[in-house]
Amino acid sequence: MKDNNNYNVLIVGNKGREYALAQRLQQDERVNALYFCLGNGGTQDLGENLECEHYEHIVELALKKQIHLAIISEEEFLVLGLTEMLEKAGILVFGASKEAAKLEASKSYMKAFVKECGIKSASYFETNDLKEALSYIQNASFPLVIKALNKNTSIVYQEEEAIKILEDAFKQSNEPVIIEPFLEGFELSVTALIANDDFILLPFCQNYKRLLEGDNGVNTGGMGAIAPANFFSNELEEKIKNHIFKPTLEKLQADNTPFKGVLLAEIVIIEEKGVLEPYLLDFSVRFKDIECQTILPLLESSLLDLCLATAKGELHSLELVFSKEFVMSVALVSRNYPTSSSPKQTLYIDPVDEKKGHLILGEVEQDNGVFESSGGRVIFAIGRGKSLLEARNHAYEIAQKVHFEGMFYRKDIGFKVLDLKEYS
């Protein structure tokens, strides 16, 4: 569907995924200009970072800069209805509608939605009363998963740990808390392009969320990832399509909920009576760190065409081609991630062999060519290779090109599928 038009593109967000999207879009000669709200220290070298005071201001800036396509990857702005506001202003938008964004923004809404669809997911107990929650865990079997404050997901192994998490959650908010049994299995992140009743699956990804080697420590947004995670039969992929994505889109359509963007399903594969079954853990309604920067290097087709076809609701016109290579991403994080903020640190970056991979700048600031850390997941080392082992070796070689005080990264990304005996 390639056209010869020129496009001014606005990307809403300020993390590694926005840098990854921009880095790829910049390679398309039809992209006339890139703008970011707010962007980060890396994106300012790829386009123009705009000062955005509030979400209504973004619409004003988009009109001023004559934006043709907006890509929204910040949940907050999707929930506030930025998609609808930009579309009303005549701008194409790659992003979920306000109503669809509730699938990520509200754990309570998502669980009720999934139950109504008949999608396999963990059983759950929901309450906005601390006493009820404490009473429930007294009789529950551990480990448990506690989803609180609509963002924090904790895997807990002891009652004392659960009590502390629940008490802290109810001190901060009256939002309902979800308590589920922990589902043991092989986890996958499955990203789909959604255009209302149509969808296309992108390569499967495996996100290593726990902070420490061997999948220990607290949950994070992702310490590393591999793609494609194609270790399963076509039959399992069909189950994921037919038992998770199709029922979801059918209900969205029945509820008159528009959706033109990305839907990411976090799935756990469980063996039941000798048969592999996908269970849904969570939904996200946008590109996610770290999946985005792991999948994009596999895309040989135009990212601009992908976004345009999705935003126009014309996925049928899209022909996607993916590389046969493997990709591994490793998050280089600041000392106190993810529990608290860390002091800013100056980054020192050595040259990278781009035949082996590249770096994605995440939570960084830049002043006169000097980069500083500004958050938890600072930089992502991306390795490519003809095998997963080669991609792994390249990712860790690239990770060693970055230096800042307190830098930490997991050294076992891929251990679940590679023969890394010291971590298994």
UniProtKB/Swiss-Prot annotation:
SUPFAM superfamilies: Glutathione synthetase ATP-binding domain-like (SSF56059), PreATP-grasp domain (SSF52440), Rudiment single hybrid motif (SSF51246). The keyword ATP-binding applies. It catalyses: 5-phospho-beta-D-ribosylamine + glycine + ATP = N(1)-(5-phospho-beta-D-ribosyl)glycinamide + ADP + phosphate + H(+). InterPro entries: ATP-grasp, ATP_grasp_subdomain_1, PreATP-grasp_dom_sf, PRibGlycinamid_synth_ATP-grasp, PRibGlycinamide_synth, PRibGlycinamide_synth_C-dom, PRibGlycinamide_synth_C_sf, PRibGlycinamide_synth_N. ATP binds at residues 137-189. Disulfide bonds: none annotated. Its EC number is 6.3.4.13. SMART domains: GARS_A, GARS_C. Keywords: ATP-binding, Ligase, Nucleotide-binding, Purine biosynthesis. Belongs to the GARS family. This is Phosphoribosylamine--glycine ligase. It comes from Helicobacter pylori (strain ATCC 700392 / 26695).
